[in-house]
Amino acid sequence: MYKRQELEIKYILDLKDFPGDPNEKLFIKDFNIILNDPEVKVVVETMGGLHPAYEFVSACLKAGKSVVTSNKELVAAKGCELLGYAAEHNVNFLFEASVGGGIPIIRPISQCLAANEINEFAGILNGTTNFILTRMINDGMAFEDALKLAQDNGYAERDPSADILGFDACRKVCILASLCFGKHVYPDQVHTEGITEITLEDVEYAKDWGGVIKLLGRARKSEDGKHIYAIVSPAFVDHHSQLASVDDVFNAILVRGDAIGDVVFYGRGAGKLPTASAVVGDVIDCARHENKQKFFGWADSEEGYVSDYLDMPTALYVRARAQQKQQVISSAEKTFGEIKLLKRAGAPEDEFAFVTPVASERELRTKLETLLGAEIISTIRVTDY
């Protein structure tokens, strides 16, 4: 028979004082009160950062308390270890809110898609950068102006580095790749680029190609299935892709399984209520699985598990300038084979742009170095999502 279980907040740990707050009596400043209280079965960590979150969470798990977190930095760096502590002590470590805010993604991958072998995923994982790129694409705003608008609207921090340099998306890629492929992926294993070098000229060339520029976090299995590639970078996305129509602060994650094909998870990737929705959902899941651990986790990875991103197959968009433009274009056609030339209104006479065929990025960049007389202005990866 189903038995309803009541949940009650017993403590709120914070170093600040909150006089007059409706929950004023719940606030404490000593973590050990929580750790040593046998009535506390589930602990929620939302402080962010690696320390002291790691010390607090590991202590709780070792004390037989389940933990729910929204802390992507913690899970990306220490997820395998903390899941191990949870298994050892028959409790749960859940982190649905660490990727995609309120978008259900961790549980669907681990449960609903469990019958699939996941081959790859690609996602718009950061709302700040997606808002900036949307304004550049739809309104013709320069990067600096779009960033300021994002800050004015509360979508970007005063120091936006973690977002615009790709670090936030990198942590989410680590979590998703670990979950999808079964071995831990660490942040320093993921090649990471941001959007600070994207210009309106690139946006216009992407439009002529037939798509838009998005900051994508991606991972895929190698052909032999023994390794993976993982990368965060701007990418050309075809207009027909579901990812191309994801605008402003929304996130979307495309997952490719051998049985299901392509599945896309879409929604608000940040914000108080979406994040709270995911956190509370995990708390309820812990309550439903009291005294029994969910089969959930991954193994640690060996050296070389994440392959060099330069060996990953891709096409490249190339923007360049050359005094002898036609001669260099002819050389590019001989070097790369069939290339797609792009155009934009108002381009200088010496500027040109093209998209290469698919090859390993290492091979493509080696060939670019042989284009004598060409000054390469920018390159962006081209995807098939």
Locate each region found by the language model:
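N-terminal glycine-/serine-/threonine-rich beta1-alpha1-beta2 phosphate-ribose binding loop
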Residues: 3-63
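Flexible, glycine/charged-enriched surface loops at secondary-structure junctions
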Residues: 6, 160-163, 184-192, 290-301, ...
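General beta-strand structural signal in soluble alpha/beta enzymes
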Residues: 27-28, 45, 68-70, 93-97, ...
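Rossmann-like NAD(P)H-binding beta-loop-alpha module
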Residues: 40, 87-168, 175
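Rossmann-fold NAD(P)-binding glycine/threonine-rich loop
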Residues: 47, 53-63, 70-111
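Catalytic, metal-anchored helix/loop core of enzyme active sites in primary metabolism
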Residues: 118-122, 130-133, 137, 149, ...
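Substrate-binding/catalytic subdomain of NAD(P)-dependent oxidoreductase enzymes
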Residues: 145-245, 250-252, 271
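A conserved regulatory-domain signal marking ACT and ACT-like small-molecule sensing domains
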Residues: 283-385
